[in-house]
Amino acid sequence: MIIAIRGPLYVSQIIFLFFPHPFSNFVSKYQIMSVATSRTGTENARISINQEKCTACGLCVKVCKDFSLIIEDNILKINQKPLFGCIGCGHCVAVCPHDAIAVNGRTLNPEDFSKLEKDNLPDYESINQLLLNRRSTRDFKDKPVQQEIIDKILAMASTAPMGLPPSDVGVMVLNSKEKVKQFSFDFIDLLERMKWMVSPASLTLMRPFMRKDDYLLFKSFVIPMVSFFTESRKRDENYLLYDAPLAMMFYGNMSDPADPYIAATYATLAAESLGLGACMIGSVGPFLKNTGKDFKRKYGLPSKMRDSIIVIFGYPQVKFSKTIKRSFERVYYV
């Protein structure tokens, strides 16, 4: 049996794997509460049913994997013994053909739902062409990115899948070339103070305690990178964020570690569709997980950050005329 679970794995999930629904004996002994996020704690979303509109078609019951909804005597009811309690995924509202269900709480309200437009969806070839056109852009025109464009990028990135709603991803926006440069140099100054941690001497001392791949990563990439950043900073050159006119840092707190990266990926695709170039910068986040208290305070970042990544944006100086065929390390079927 192969089990893949997005989001944190909680004890109640493990129990459910081995004691699938119904598990009334379990829930009768233990209080069921919704899975925690940094934004909502363990608050449950609240489901309401308009019985005058409901036809008990069962679609909402089918899509609710929390078992928060049940049909009894041909009447849709709220289950008093769900798996976790409503997490506010909104599937029941989105699937109901009669607008008979509403969900409030965990940042959701009825105004957040809107009708899908299915007549203007891009086909495979259109999406594939967008993806093939995308390149990592590090050379930008000296031109600011308008607020309207920034808002569109953020709106599209906010639709990214998440391990558990509501999203725990935060976004720090640096919306000018000057702010991006100041952030870069502040971070490089932090690296300068931490340089002893990634020096050849330190690496030699740590070698017996490191995995081979980690050792090679530090030796071949991290140490030369830190040295290059600090030396170029002395020449007033920004090779960290390349003097981009716009940068966004996507970070997570309690969230699934993948969430910031998925949102950042959506942001790069939004930028491509809007005529911007973008590039993911992964060299900042790892250093801020357990250090940089004053730096994080200055930029409004949480003191306890998990995974994070920066995306730089701008109008590209260079236009590419070819795409590149990429491949996975391997693909196999089992």
Where are these regions (language model features)?
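Acidic, surface-exposed loops and disordered segments
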Residues: 4-9, 18-334
